[in-house]
Curated annotation (Swiss-Prot):
Record organism: Agkistrodon bilineatus (Cantil)
Activity regulation description: Inhibited by calcium.
Subcellular location: Secreted
The protein's Enzyme Commission number: 3.4.21.-
Designated name of the protein: Protein C activator
Amino acid sequence: VVGGDECNINEHRSLALMYA
């Protein structure tokens, strides 16, 4: 599930940036 993992990481990064 590499694609899914990458997508998840991308979403997490976006959320972290928004929360930062």
